[in-house]
From Swiss-Prot:
It catalyses: homogentisate + O2 = 4-maleylacetoacetate + H(+). SUPFAM superfamilies: RmlC-like cupins. The keyword Acetylation does not apply. This is Homogentisate 1,2-dioxygenase. One of its GO terms (molecular function) is homogentisate 1,2-dioxygenase activity. It holds the Pfam family HgmA_C. Homogentisate binds at residues 333, 354.
């Protein structure tokens, strides 16, 4: 069961009477609870941008204890001098016999001033271990397996073909439902993700607000040792407290985790000719101070009909002002016949040329242009700043050092 509607002002209580009926912070909360506000923006942001929630919890967060440096860090050094070459990786993870939870299985791929990209692998649930990111919100894009995200606000269920966003500062733990789970993760330290403007598309289309789902209140009333790991100022810290931090019995507000089924995306595409720009596939965006230039765009290339006439239908050859990190959830990407499979990654930074490989080009340039259904799901994390690759990703054996060879079959066919 979920609450529906992107950015709505929701309210939920796991125990009847836990929510104050007429105010935020009564002198004495019912059921012996404590009132606590969680702010996602400054107090004086305009009303339509203002994010906050009131939580009614068994113990306030100030009782969590002292944080100390954690034994390892997920943030990794970035390559100092990065070439303008296109880069691609095969999937980083194989199945592991070693127990690995979500935090232990994070792999830092690349970063920019406001955004970081990771992959995750986990085959072991976080039972009495919790995570919070004070540096930004987290966007989950799974490509195999099923996980449940137990948060301060309630539970989200997540599997391939869906996404979830955990806001900055919200504590959660990952329960692995399948044998193992793998996915992509994007950390956004800019403005919170929101729905893109639709412009001439009109009032409807792309990701519809009604399809975003928020959790109903659920809580853990457990005592004993509970470890909280917190990412703060690019470092990991930990504390051990004597109770679960997921002790919120009721909440109301518009700052909360949410999930979304990507199959509900209302795809807009051409019904005449030419390949539209990929911005029409934007699901969520983090706006910058420059209109139309985003800190982060989350873009998908979902299952869709291709019907353009007298047109080269795959994505065109391109040199972009923006910086692209792509992944594949399932299927075969229509611009890459080989080498780009689910779990793979490609990075094409500003002005780095990219486009269909030779084999894909040859097929698309000569095929009979009947209506064709593409049954795949690729995505892109697009940023205004360069993706700086981490040293560990650059040296990883899954990096395809021969990636550029996929374009070497093209020949000069010009004739006068």
């Amino acid at each position: 069961m979920y609450l529906q509607g992107f950015g709505n002002y929701h309210h939920s209580e796991a125990v009847k009477g836990a929510l104050p009926p007429n105010q935020n912070s009564p002198q004495h909360c019912s059921l012996g609870l404590y009132a606590e506000q969680l702010s996602g923006t400054s107090f004086t942001r305009p009303r339509h941008n203002n994010l906050r929630s009131w939580l009614y919890r068994i113990l306030p967060t100030v009782t969590q204890g002292t944080y100390y440096p954690y034994e390892f860090n997920i943030m990794q050094p970035l390559v100092d001098e990065l070439s303008p070459n296109a880069m691609r990786w095969s999937p980083l993870y194989n199945s592991s016999q070693i127990k690995c939870d979500f935090v232990e299985g994070l792999f830092h791929i690349a970063g920019s001033p406001l955004v970081n990209a990771y992959t995750y692998y986990c085959n072991h649930s976080m039972s009495d271990k919790y995570f919070a990111n004070n540096d930004g919100e987290l966007l989950f894009v799974p490509y195999t397996g099923e996980i449940h995200l137990h948060t301060e606000f309630g539970k989200l269920m997540l599997s391939s073909g869906s996404i979830a966003v955990i806001p900055r500062g919200v504590k959660f733990k990952v329960e692995v439902i399948s044998k193992e789970a793998k996915g992509y993760l994007c950390e956004n330290s800019g403005n919170p993700l929101t729905l893109p403007q639709l412009g001439p598309i009109g009032a409807n289309g792309l990701a519809n607000p009604r399809h975003f789902q928020y959790p109903v209140a659920a809580f853990e009333n457990s005592v004993g040792e509970h470890t909280i790991i917190c990412k703060n100022q690019k470092k990991l810290w930990f504390t051990v407290c004597n109770h679960s931090p997921l002790n919120v019995v009721a909440w109301h507000g518009n700052y909360a985790p949410y999930c979304y089924d990507l199959s509900l995306f209302n795809t807009i595409n051409t019904v005449s000719f030419d390949h539209p720009d990929p911005s029409i596939f934007t699901v969520l965006t983090s706006e910058s101070e420059i209109p139309g230039v985003s800190n982060l765009d989350f873009v998908i290339f979902p299952p869709r009909w291709m019907v353009a006439e007298h047109t080269f239908r795959p994505p065109y050859f391109h040199r972009n002002y923006m910086n692209e990190l792509m992944g594949l959830v399932y299927g075969e990407y229509d611009a890459k016949k080989e080498g780009f499979i689910p779990g793979g990654i490609s990075i094409h930074n500003c002005m780095t040329p990219h486009g269909p490989d030779y084999e894909s080009y040859e097929i698309a340039a000569s095929q009979d242009l009947k209506p064709n259904y593409i049954n795949s799901l690729a995505f892109m994390f697009e940023t205004k700043d360069y993706w700086q690759v981490t040293e560990q990703a650059y040296r990883h054996p899954s990096r395809q050092i021969d990636y550029l060879n996929c374009w070497q079959g093209f020949k000069i066919e010009f004739s006068q």
